[in-house]
Amino acid sequence: MMQRNASLKNIIDESAVKLESCYRELRAVMPEYFFTAFSENEICAMLPFLTLLKPDGIPLQTEIGRKIFRFYLRAENGSVLRGADGGKFAELPFTGAVIHESCKPFTPAGNGQFLVVESFTVTPLPKEAPVFTFAEIAKYFTDRSGQAPAGAEELYPRLNWEQLSDLTVDRLAERIEMTLEIQGESRAAVRIVPLGENRFKMLVAAPNAFAGSSYFTRIVEEFRLSNFHIERAYWREFSKALPKEDLDHATVDFGSFYFTGEAEKMAGFERAVKALYWTADDDLFYRELTVRRRWNPADVNFLRAGAEFIHSQFSFVDRSAYNYEDIARFIVLYPEICAELLELFRSRFDPDRDGPLTGEEPLRERIAAINSGVAERDNLSRNIFRALLNFTDSILKTNFFVVDKGALAFRLDPAFMKFYEEISPEYGKAFPADRPYGIFFFFRRNAAGFQVRFSEIARGGWRTVVPRIGTHDLERGDYFEAARDEFFREVYVLAHTQHSKNKDIFEGGSKMITLLRTEGTGDWHSELWEAQKAVFAAFLSLINFDADGTLRDARIIDRLGVREIVEIGPDENMFDNMISYMGRQGIRAGYTLGSGIISGKPESGINHKEYGVTSFGVHEYFLRTMKELDIDPFKDDFSVKISGGPFGDVAGNLMKLLLRKENGNFCYPAMRIVAVTDGPAALFDPDGIDRDELSKLVLRENLDKFDPRRLRGEGAFIIFSAPCREGDEEYYRQVIRKEGKCVENKLSRDDFMRLFQSNLHRCADIFLPCGGRPSTVNIDNWRLFANGEGRGCRAIVEGANSFLTPAARIELQKSGILDVKDASANKCGVITSSYEILSGLMLDEEEFRSEKAVLVPQVMEKLAFNARREAEWLFATRSVTGEFLTDLTDRLSRSINAKNVQIGEYLERHPEVVSDELLLDHLPGIFRTKYRDRLKRLPAEYRKAIASVELAGRIIYNSANGLENEIALALKK
């Protein structure tokens, strides 16, 4: 027993000697700041692991308190966070990270081995009291520069003191400044400071939308690829966010890196670190060009963007041959051609580049010479690189060389489309014949988009398409790829439709669509807002001009040379907080229209959903269509089916109008809404959906909140889109009324989808599509919507944009169904937005708020006038000519738009025709009675455009009234 105790004592003594020796060595080789970064308890807990380290051994890992620690040895030519060992930390949602490397070799491990200690904070640390009061921080700022920066006092209570106890006041102040710079943006701020003898300090501030920890590991990997040596690094959650809906005050992560490197590489390294914040690091471009060939990730983004763009076009040439994966593969197989293409692009748009433009001919010859021995493959490769060259030639301006950004934006000449038409005639058939006035293209990690407009001054909504968020991981990619193949056609067709419906206002038509691939984390709103903020900032940089017509950002070379004024409206997945944010950013940037860059602002605009302006117009066309069907909705029995749910803007507000009561009674007493089909649920009731129950949901809840106990008719049912689980079984819930009782059923996914889709086919007098994806009714399925056994309708009023394809419209009208096209039926939303923007330009914000109660009813009067005037013209003309209603909508739009162009050209030569009286006729009455002097606030381009569209409408509607109007005009003479 005594011998065993003696042996144990010897072991303990030997261990104590080892630990003490290790501690002394640690003191000798680690920088002093190491002992500030880690507590005494943490350092003591490290020592046993440090004694076990071996050269070329695997990293040792342990958990100490709330942190994960890793210890390993690095040879002089090794790297931190090495290889696959560090890869797993990219997915670890840590709130703090520290890397420390010894200044000298760690002697216990042998010669040439440096000790690396890493720690990752993975659970919240105990709250700590602030190290400095705000008064102390403010005094530092005052002593240094006169005053504390704006926003510092608001930021102070959000500082994450648990992570900041080691900072001195000067370091804290520096980080506060950088945090204030970027907490409302989707980009990183980077500062590199020389410390002498090729030593540098880099500070990085980055909004942590949902993946800040992975940004840290990407930066560390870029150090390795650049052959820079990290001595120590820190990553911490510097400040907490306000609620995630607050887009101006995000959580900000902060990184500090102390390293050695070559001074001449610093500018490129800074570009790379900034780009990595919003750049993919898991794709073929990163692996082949950044990792393998050491290309700067900022430069590689040009090729990524180009690949995304040409894929969006080749989708209408041959989707199978030109799938995205093959496009990317063929591009990276020819890095020399990629380098020449990038050089050509630089020669045109890099403001720091001197010398002549690079010629295209050598590049064209190199592309033509591609020859792998496989003819079909080579033909694809040549077309891909010719398409990339076409993309480059089409660029008129870009923010690519802007220092601080979170996305790329390109203004393109729409003539690029000719290239694809020459490859295949099928391409041209995919789009309306009219070609756009201008196209913008946007790109960043997991997001791409277009803005298409058909006139110089144009407006239209910004839609973000987020394919099937809640689906299985194995299917989510399929839905994304399907949307990816179609989204250029979607934005094109919607913009073209918008141009048709904008005939009553001075702006032509446009549309903006962003396609977003979500990470599947569940917090898709944060991903949505991060992408929208980045794309908006990139877009704004290309349309933000000084008073003299020069772009404000001097790093953008403008080969177009024309001031562009663009307006945006809200659309799918555009929430009030983002609308308000964009308005504020428009003011901060000094944009021509200020907050008028977007309409529908809840605090200083005419919010479409609040006032139901789009649905107001749809309802006017509904009433006129019912008259044509010889149905008096105020007394006759009739049935309705609707796509879109009670919480949606158009569907919800239309339900509000259809379900309204006067003196306690329904205005349409015998109306039956037999079917409603919405994303969260589908509802059918042959006796008519319970109107009181449906009314409870309108503009408050989605359709899945409908109480199944309120089902009425035999066979009535509701199905729910959210899948249910019991063990390994997944099913969909149905409640159906059978023999007077509600019965629960479990449906397979296929049965659910069959019922969901067929709910749109139910028999009703009138179909009101007010929500759903474009091309839902198409040439392949139109017969299911035509009249037949238990299905169909007598008329359609299109509240949703492009819900029917042109071919489907023709076939349905041939079958005898009346169809009021979207460009007529839902135009009142955009008319409202136009008046909102004009009112915002002419009134101060407080005036707008105070006059809103008067202004909105006057706008509604304008909406009623425009909707009724067109509806009467459509049905009157149809009764005479027999033309389809949709063709008449197109004819009217083309006539007014063509006349508008002619008048605009005339007004260029005769500006005296643009009178105040003409402008006031177009505007709500309050501007004639109270604010006539504000007309001078309108940009000259707007004055001419307003006069032009006002005259065009008068001329076309008057001339379209035929012989009766001609006689009336003759009698006046």
Segments the model singles out, each with a brief description of its role:
Residues 198, 460-474, 593-607, 727-740, ...:
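Gly-rich Lys/Arg/Thr-decorated short loops/hinges at beta-loop-alpha junctions or inter-strand turns
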Residues 283, 491-638, 665, 677:
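Glycine/serine-rich phosphate-binding loop and adjoining beta1-alpha1 elements at the start
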Residues 493, 623-641, 663-671, 685-699, ...:
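Non-transmembrane, aqueous-exposed alpha-helical and coiled segments at domain scale
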Residues 298-302, 412-416, 434-462, 500-524, ...:
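Conserved phosphate/anionic-ligand binding catalytic regions in large, soluble enzymes, centered on
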Residues 331-383, 390, 610-643, 647-725, ...:
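Extended, regular secondary-structure scaffolds
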Residues 2-437, 442-451, 464-484, 527, ...:
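Non-catalytic interaction/regulatory segments
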Residues 475-482, 501, 505, 522-530, ...:
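Alpha-helix capping and helix-loop boundary segments enriched in small/acidic/polar residues
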Residues 138, 142, 147, 157, ...:
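Low-complexity, serine/threonine/proline-enriched polar segments
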